[in-house]
Amino acid sequence: MATLFDLPDLVLLEIFSYLPVRDRIRISRVCHRWKRLVDDRWLWRHVDLTLYTMRPKVMWHLLRRYMASRLYSLRMGGYLFSGSQAPQLSPALMRALGQKCPNLKRLCLHVADLSMVPITSLPSTLRTLELHSCEISMIWLQKEQDPTVLPLLECIVLDRVPAFRDEHLQGLTRFRALRSLVLGGTYRVTETGLDASLQELSYLQRLEVLGCTLSADSTLLAISRHLRDVRKIRLTVGGLSAQGLVFLEGMPVLESLCFQGPLITPDMPTPTQIVSSCLTMPKLRVLEVQGLGWEGQEAEKILCKGLPHCIVIVRACPKESMDWWM
C-alpha cells in the first residue's frame, strides 16, 4: 500500500502549500527529504501569517530563513487591539521586507497600527497594497509626502480604515501607476472629496465603493464626470435611483458592473430600467447583482433576457467578515 512518502515531490509540494506556515516548518523535521521540500522556493511565494499572533522575533526569523527573494505576496496581522504593551509592526521590519524581498509585489496588512510606520518604509516593489482594519496617521497618505514613494503601486484596498478621509484620498493622486481603488467602510470620505479626487484619478480602471456613507447616485455622478476609461465598477446600492443609472449611460469601455445590497433604498431602479441603461454601454460583458433578493425571481429572468450578450450573475450577498475584531 502506497504511503505519503511514496508520492512524487511535485505532489508533496502541492499538499504542503495548503498547510499553515507553522505546520510547514514543523514537518520539515520529519525527514531530510521533507526538509528539502519545505526549503523549496515555490512553497514560499505566497505567505499568510494572519492565522497567528506573530511576534516580531519570529517574523524576523521567517524573513531571514525562508522568505527573502522567494516571496511574492505576504499577508500579515498586527496587534491593534492587544493593548499598548503589545509589539507593533515597525519601520525597520517594513524596510527589511523591501531589502530582503525584492520580488514582493503584494502586501496585505490586517489589524495593524501603522501610525508610527511611515509609508516611505514600505517596499518600493509593491504593486498591490491592502489595509484591513488598520490605523493610519493623518500624514500617512497626504499629498505633500514624497512623490516617489511606491512608484509601481497599481492597486490599493482600504477596508475599514477609520482614519481615512478626504485628505488621504486626495493623496492617492501621486501614485501615477494606480489603476484600481477599493474603498470599503471609509465613512469619513465625503461626496465633495470623492469628486475632487476622481478628477485627478481619471486613469483609474477599477473602482469599488462599498459600505461607505456616500450615496450610489453621487458616486455614479462623479464616475461619469471623471472616469470615462473605467472598466469595472462595484458599489453598494444605498441611495441608488433610476437617475443615478442615467449617469452611467454610454460609458464607452465599462466591462463589468456590480450592484451590492442589502436593499435599503426606496428608489431602487427596476430590472427593466437597469437593462435599459446597460444596453447603452457598448463594452459591458458582466452584470452582477448581489443581496437584492432577486435570485430565482422574475427580476433575474428580466435581466438575463434583456442582456443576452452579458454574463448576468444574481446571487445573495457575500457572507459578512468573520474576523474576530469585527
From Swiss-Prot:
GO terms for cellular component: cytoplasm; ubiquitin ligase complex. SMART domains: FBOX. Pathway: Protein modification; protein ubiquitination. InterPro entries: F-box-like_dom_sf (IPR036047), F-box_dom (IPR001810), LRR_dom_sf (IPR032675). GO terms for biological process: protein ubiquitination; ubiquitin-dependent protein catabolic process. The keyword Repeat applies. Keywords: Leucine-rich repeat, Repeat, Ubl conjugation pathway. It comes from the Eukaryota. Residues 1-47 form the F-box domain. Gene3D superfamilies: Ribonuclease Inhibitor. Interacts with SKP1 and CUL1. PANTHER family: F-BOX/TPR REPEAT PROTEIN POF3, F-BOX_LRR-REPEAT PROTEIN 12. Substrate-recognition component of the SCF (SKP1-CUL1-F-box protein)-type E3 ubiquitin ligase complex. Mediates the polyubiquitination and proteasomal degradation of CAMK1 leading to disruption of cyclin D1/CDK4 complex assembly which results in G1 cell cycle arrest in lung epithelia. This is F-box/LRR-repeat protein 12. It comes from Mus musculus.
